[in-house]
């Protein structure tokens, strides 16, 4: 890393909260007031020890206490286990020592129970009390035995109490008495015991409570209430929180009130919940305990997906299954499609049982799963349905090795019969999308809302009620009615098949149940002890079309899935040896079983790390954390941390909410930048402070006296990024590694740099993660391939920000004071200063363009009249006002000179860059540049498009494969005739703006509506419009050239029927596109981009001939002039044209185009016309422009602005010294008088 840029951060010293230099933070140190010596520290421990030695500890004193107790804890841990705690355990220990209550959501084998037990012994050594709650009596017994063994190992005397079923009544009373008197160190019992005895036990005094397998503890509301009572919450507290949660949608401040209740009642208590897969959520418990549960749906999978073809008769199927079971060995799950029913499962069990010990699992014999787990059953058979017991209710990583699917998991129903509610919901949504009937769209929304609140078992029950004619729900009955009606329409059926990825065969509708495939195959690949096991899935294909649809759906959900053919006779999977694969899977299971049986964590678990992943946006944080499992959520200060699981990582994802620091407005140096000069040598030191926001939406860095907002003087401050830094520093202390994944541009690099410096004293292992799309694959690549920080990008941003501040503040002050006084004299307004006025290096030349263009427009205006031949409204004729005869309702004559049909080949345009997207969004839909950028930012953060601030047209191989996948989907094997892959550019990290999945807008809308793609925020019609533009432009960029069929009509316009006197017209021809042709017959309406007018399907030439009754090319028609408008030969700017001009003249950058236009509008210098969206300067704008050009033209000239931006680009590339540029700007502003 080259020399770091000088800067100072106010209120940021980790120890005293005063100003600290970037150099000291970079060295992991504190400010010079706290530590005179300027030296480097490699860890927070080293820093704290030095400050302690000098008696200078202040805010960091709490860390000294935590570290001291951490060392004691670790020593105890080592004495018991034989080696120190690993990544996540270190994090859990620190959180306990900070007296935080939290939930551990981690896979089996990461030592959660061990941690809980050792923590209770640690507290016992301090003479504190602990309660441990387990789901079963056998686990209570195991915990008692382990505590006894551990206390003997460590010589910790502990008074251990536990409840077991063998004690008599007098012993029970003695137990209750001891508990209520506090005469114990550790008490262990089952969850059931506490539910039954809560009245006797709710006043127990304790310091630490550990709830093992909290899923069991949350099975019922009574169970959850018991936990809350034990935590100290009363019934009134629970009722209050329920009421507050009802209001939370309208009023987020209720969470502050809940936090107060939590703080008051949990005082002095630390409560830890443990679960492998916390899927049950109790909103009140979550709110009061300060976390939200995650889920078991983990999309990480290390599965070899294989296929073979299902034989046509049952005997051959049985023989194939026997062969597979023999080759693959024990530990298999066999899934039968739900349409074949339990009878088929029982049939297979009977046929296979003569050779293997196999059992069909139903709700009545789930105890057999334990026999299977213990190795007493060879394989299990179950139903391939989303709510099947083997699909959802089994997690045995040491035993399950492979899954066999006897047919594709599917929904299958006869057209007209009662279908599964999940299928009903999907088809209803498709019908709404196809018909555009808002009643159906709303009905589909209500059905989805109902189903999302129901468990799989409840959905199954309602489906059965519908089939038996017992369904009473009016909404669902209406949904069945609508679907059955539309399924009788063959056109609708065809469109549903195209849109919804289903197969219609012999009067049946087949839909692949891809979520069941993911869940069921996922049983073979689980995380255990920091290792993601390898699994094998064998899919026996019974319908090739359905398989193709399944493959497409899985690719959308899993990013990538590779199918290999299983050749059982050749003992091959693809080109790999089947025996080698099975041996590898068996070795993994033996290793896991060894860990499980020995009950200890292997030292190899040291590779498991806690990783803090920091991004800007909460939406992006939520999107990323959802890629791997539904995350658990923690609230720290003003940020939410999403905790999720990777193979060997616990990932904590948190968001900064954009920039954390900005230049101070305090009276330091020149507008917050200190200038140091020694002879000809300069240094520029910007001073940064944390960003704040008041209740009225004003953003600032520095309070007025009395913690007031400097703009509106309120003391109601809703955001202070100091709290963000504090929260991130807490998380940094827990993490083994920190990755900062802010946007891949100069602003993103500066945010990352600021965070890096703020956290460096707390954790030295910090790197930069770069990604250009928010997809699972891209995020994993970024996590696994971090890079150093690019200080050149940081320096470039510093130059931009200082230049913007200096020029902006200097010129703005002139406008607000000097200019405004003069303006008010001329226009009779108050002569006080106007703080809304501003000027900037880029803003000012752009304003000048708008003013000049408006003047040119006015100077070249003329009136134009128009009319058309009766019956052909599409063909309009325009003439200039050139004499008194040309007026409204006057007649003129059109002589058709020639008509012809042309065929032209049009090469596709490249995919979007920022400027071209802004242009088209404004031209096609009238969406402003700033609104388009907000929408594109959302689409990027939600993982739907690549990074949107780019001037590159390059498309990666990944992008090309997305286009290929989509075209193959819609055109089948003929897609090669229309697909022409193009990269549109070479090298570089940035790509053009493109979709991240092969989904057109209708497919995306359907997946979002059905909840198959879960987005971190709701998207609007405008989001879909912009996505549609991006998708069309991208797909078209990968097509062969288009053949465009045009009709051209050439004519003269005259005053008389003989055309002796020709009139001046706008143009003497009209062209119409009547068709677009591709090499194959295809409906291109969903994916083709045309930068042109609409396609006229009916021939204008034919209409002309039919209307006039003549085929004569020399035809003369009399037409009436029906209207007029004023037109100039010079067009006013639209936002689209202004962006194109900025790009052409190299003024501004992709990240600033929208901001510049937005600022000019906000200042009132320009207004936008309502209908035509033209930009018109106001009187104020004209006068500001005149003032700036007269007095400061050299500072706001196009040439100077362009040169400066080029110099900043050179700083980014490391080709220019940023100090030299700042020196030039410094002299420049010094000359402003």
UniProtKB/Swiss-Prot annotation:
GO cellular component terms?
cytoplasm
- Give the annotated active site: 947
List the catalysed reactions: ATP + H2O = ADP + phosphate + H(+)
Q: Where is this region: Topoisomerase I?
A: 606-1233
Q: Organism's domain of life?
A: Archaea
SS bonds (residue pairs): none
What is the annotated signal peptide range for this record? none
Q: Which UniProt keywords apply?
A: ATP-binding, Cytoplasm, DNA-binding, Isomerase, Magnesium, Metal-binding, Nucleotide-binding, Topoisomerase, Zinc, Zinc-finger
* Motif position, DEAD box: 212-215
Q: Which residues bind Zn(2+) 1?
A: 13, 16, 31, 34
- Using the record's annotation, list all stretches that form the Topo IA-type catalytic domain: 790-1233
Co-factor note (free text): Binds 1 zinc ion per subunit.
Q: What class of enzyme is it?
A: isomerase
Q: Example GO biological process term? A: DNA topological change
Provide the residue positions that the database annotates as binding Mg(2+): 616, 743
> What does this protein do, in the record's words?
Modifies the topological state of DNA by introducing positive supercoils in an ATP-dependent process, increasing the linking number in steps of +1. Binds to single-stranded DNA, transiently cleaves and then rejoins the ends, introducing a positive supercoil in the process. The scissile phosphodiester is attacked by the catalytic tyrosine of the enzyme, resulting in the formation of a DNA-(5'-phosphotyrosyl)-enzyme intermediate. Probably involved in rewinding DNA strands in regions of the chromosome that have opened up to allow replication, transcription, DNA repair and/or for DNA protection.
Miscellaneous comment text of the record? This enzyme is the only unique feature of hyperthermophilic bacteria/archaea known and seems to be essential for adaptation to life at high temperatures. It may play a role in stabilization of DNA at high temperatures.
Q: What is this protein called?
A: Reverse gyrase 2
Look up and give the organism this protein is from.
Sulfurisphaera tokodaii (strain DSM 16993 / JCM 10545 / NBRC 100140 / 7) (Sulfolobus tokodaii)
């Amino acid at each position: 890393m080259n020399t770091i840029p000088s800067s100072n951060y106010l209120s940021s010293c980790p120890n005293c909260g005063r100003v600290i230099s970037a150099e000291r933070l970079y060295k992991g140190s504190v400010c010079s007031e706290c530590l005179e010596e300027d030296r480097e520290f490699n860890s927070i421990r080293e820093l704290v020890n030095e400050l302690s030695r000098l008696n200078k500890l202040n805010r960091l004193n709490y860390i000294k206490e935590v570290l001291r107790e951490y060392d004691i804890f670790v020593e105890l841990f080592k004495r018991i286990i034989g080696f120190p705690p690993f990544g996540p355990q270190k994090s859990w220990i620190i959180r306990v020592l900070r007296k935080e209550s939290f939930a551990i959501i981690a896979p089996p084998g990461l030592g959660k129970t061990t941690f809980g037990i050792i923590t209770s012994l640690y507290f016992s050594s301090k003479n504190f009390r602990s309660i441990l709650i387990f789901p079963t009596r056998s686990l209570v017994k195991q915990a008692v035995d382990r505590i006894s063994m551990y206390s003997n190992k460590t010589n910790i005397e502990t008074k251990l109490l536990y409840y077991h079923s063998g004690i008599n009544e007098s012993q029970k009373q003695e137990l209750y008495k001891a508990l209520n008197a506090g005469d114990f160190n550790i008490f262990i019992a089952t969850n059931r015991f506490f539910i039954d005895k809560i009245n006797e036990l709710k006043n127990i005094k304790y310091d630490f409570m550990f709830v093992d397998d909290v899923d069991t503890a949350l099975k019922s509301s009574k169970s959850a209430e018991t936990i809350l009572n034990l935590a100290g919450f009363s019934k009134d507290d629970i009722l209050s929180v329920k009421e507050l949660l009802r209001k939370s949608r309208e009023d987020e401040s209720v969470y502050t009130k809940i936090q107060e209740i939590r703080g008051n009642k949990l005082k002095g208590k630390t409560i830890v919940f443990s679960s492998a897969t916390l899927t049950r959520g109790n909103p009140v418990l979550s709110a009061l305990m300060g976390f939200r549960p995650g889920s078991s749906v983990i999309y990480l999978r290390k599965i070899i997906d294989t296929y073979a073809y299902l034989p046509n008769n049952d005997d051959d199927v049985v023989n194939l299954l026997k062969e597979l079971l023999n080759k693959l060995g024990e530990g298999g799950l066999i899934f039968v499609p739900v349409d074949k029913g339990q009878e088929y499962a029982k049939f297979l069990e009977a046929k296979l049982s003569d050779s293997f010990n196999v059992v069909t699992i139903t709700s009545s014999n789930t105890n057999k799963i334990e026999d299977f787990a213990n190795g007493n059953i060879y394989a299990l058979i179950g139903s391939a349905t989303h709510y099947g017991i083997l699909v959802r209710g089994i997690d045995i990583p040491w035993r399950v090795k492979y899954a066999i699917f006897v047919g594709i998991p599917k929904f299958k129903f006869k057209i007209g019969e009662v279908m599964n509610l999940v299928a009903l919901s999907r088809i209803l949504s498709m019908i709404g999308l196809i018909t555009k009937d808002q009643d159906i769209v709303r009905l589909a929304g209500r059905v989805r809302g109902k189903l999302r609140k129901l468990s799989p078992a409840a959905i199954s029950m309602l489906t059965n009620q519908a089939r038996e004619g017992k369904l009473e729900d009016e909404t669902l009955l209406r949904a069945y009615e609508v679907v059955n009606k539309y399924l009788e329409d063959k056109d609708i059926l065809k469109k549903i098949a195209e849109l919804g990825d289903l197969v219609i065969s012999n009067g049946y509708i087949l839909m692949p149940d891809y979520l069941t495939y993911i869940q069921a195959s996922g049983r073979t690949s689980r995380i255990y002890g920091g290792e993601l096991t390898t699994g094998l899935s064998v899919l026996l294909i019974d319908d090739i079309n359905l398989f193709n649809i399944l493959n497409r759906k899985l690719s959308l959900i899993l990013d990538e899935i590779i199918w290999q053919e299983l050749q059982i006779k050749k003992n091959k999977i693809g080109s790999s040896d089947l025996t080698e694969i099975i041996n590898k899977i068996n070795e993994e299971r033996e290793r896991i079983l060894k860990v499980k049986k020995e009950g200890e964590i292997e030292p190899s678990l040291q590779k498991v790390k806690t990783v803090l992943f920091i991004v800007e946006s909460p939406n992006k944080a939520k999107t990323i954390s959802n890629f791997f499992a539904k995350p658990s959520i923690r609230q720290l200060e003003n940020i939410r941390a999403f905790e999720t699981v990777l193979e060997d990582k616990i990932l904590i994802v948190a968001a900064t909410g954009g920039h954390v620091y900005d230049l101070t407005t305090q009276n330091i140096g020149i507008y917050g930048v200190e200038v140091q000069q020694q002879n000809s040598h300069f240094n520029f030191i910007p001073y940064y402070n944390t960003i704040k926001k008041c209740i009225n939406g004003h953003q600032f860095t520095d309070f007025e006296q009395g913690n007031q907002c400097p703009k509106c003087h309120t003391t109601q401050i809703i955001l202070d990024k100091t709290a963000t830094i504090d929260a991130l520093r807490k998380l940094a202390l827990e993490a083994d590694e920190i990755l900062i994944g802010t946007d891949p541009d100069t602003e993103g690099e500066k945010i990352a740099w600021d965070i890096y410096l703020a956290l460096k004293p707390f954790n030295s292992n910090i790197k930069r993660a770069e990604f250009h799309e928010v997809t699972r694959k891209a995020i994993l690549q970024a996590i696994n391939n971090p890079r150093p920080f690019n200080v050149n990008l940081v320096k470039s941003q510093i130059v931009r920000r200082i230049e913007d501040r200096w020029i902006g503040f200097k010129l703005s002050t002139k406008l607000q004071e000097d200019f405004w006084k003069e303006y008010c004299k001329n226009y009779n307004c108050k002569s006080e200063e106007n703080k809304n006025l501003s000027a900037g290096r880029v803003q000012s030349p752009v304003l000048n363009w708008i003013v000049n263009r408006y003047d040119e427009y006015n100077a070249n205006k003329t009136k134009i009249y128009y009319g058309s031949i009766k019956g052909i409204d599409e063909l309009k004729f325009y003439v200039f006002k050139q004499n008194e005869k040309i007026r409204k309702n006057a007649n003129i004559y059109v002589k058709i000179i020639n008509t012809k049909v042309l065929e032209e080949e049009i090469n596709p345009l490249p995919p979007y860059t920022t400027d071209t997207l802004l242009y088209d969004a404004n031209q096609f839909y009238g969406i402003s540049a700033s609104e388009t950028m907000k929408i594109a930012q959302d689409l990027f953060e939600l993982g739907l498009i690549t990074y949107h601030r780019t001037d590159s047209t390059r498309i990666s191989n990944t992008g090309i494969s997305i286009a290929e996948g989509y075209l193959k989907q819609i055109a089948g094997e003929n897609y090669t005739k229309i697909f022409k892959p193009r990269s549109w550019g070479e090298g570089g990290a940035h790509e053009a703006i493109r979709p991240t999945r092969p989904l057109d807008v209708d497919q995306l809308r359907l997946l979002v509506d059905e909840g198959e793609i879960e987005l971190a925020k709701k998207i609007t019609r405008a989001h879909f419009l912009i996505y549609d533009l991006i998708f069309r432009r991208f797909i078209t960029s990968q097509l062969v050239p288009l053949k465009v069929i045009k009709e051209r009509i050439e004519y003269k316009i005259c005053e008389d029927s003989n055309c002796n006197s020709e009139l001046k017209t706008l143009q003497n021809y009209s062209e119409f596109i009547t068709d677009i042709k591709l090499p194959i017959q295809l409906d291109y309406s969903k994916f083709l981009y045309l930068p042109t007018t609409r396609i006229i399907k009916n021939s204008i030439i034919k209409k002309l001939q039919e209307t006039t009754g003549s085929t004569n090319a020399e035809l003369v028609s009399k037409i009436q002039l029906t209207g007029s408008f004023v037109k100039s030969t010079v067009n006013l700017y639209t936002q689209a044209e202004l962006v194109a001009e900025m790009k052409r003249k190299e003024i501004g950058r992709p990240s600033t185009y929208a901001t510049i236009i937005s600022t000019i509008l906000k200042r009132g210098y320009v207004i936008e016309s309502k209908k035509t969206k033209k930009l018109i300067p106001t009187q104020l704008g004209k006068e500001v422009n005149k003032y700036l050009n007269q007095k400061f033209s050299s500072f706001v000239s196009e040439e100077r602005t362009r040169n400066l931006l080029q110099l900043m680009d050179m700083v980014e590339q490391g080709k220019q010294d940023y100090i030299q540029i700042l020196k030039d700007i410094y002299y420049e502003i010094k000359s402003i008088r």
